[in-house]
Amino acid sequence: MKNTLLNDEKLIVTSFMYTPADGDIVVISHGQHLDEPIVKRVIATEGQTLKIDFDRQQVYVDGKQIDEPYVSSEIVQGDSVIPEIIPEGKIFVMGDNRAISNDSRYNQVGLIDVDDIIGKAQFRVLPINKIGYLY
């Protein structure tokens, strides 16, 4: 999630009555393929259409290009087949540092089951000089 979040930063995560939404930063449990929880950004949720144009470096959800000022590197293609429509009960996530992020573009992570979402990262508490809400 570099530059939005860096390793060892401490976050407040909320999970009460949470439904994932596009653009949210979420903490995901290890699931079946991961050794530890990961932090990623929700790109598309169940029922939404998704297209990633790797040549133009653009992401489209429901036919509209999404504005991603937080992305810190070019989007590279992974080894996973990206579905045209996100299946029920799943979300598609990517990290903000797209060149090196292990996310839904890769089979190791793939589509995320909504039951594997720990919660939404709301607020950074450490380091002190970066305290604030996450958007």
What are these regions (language model features)?
Residues 3-135:
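Soluble "head" domains of membrane/secretory-pathway proteins
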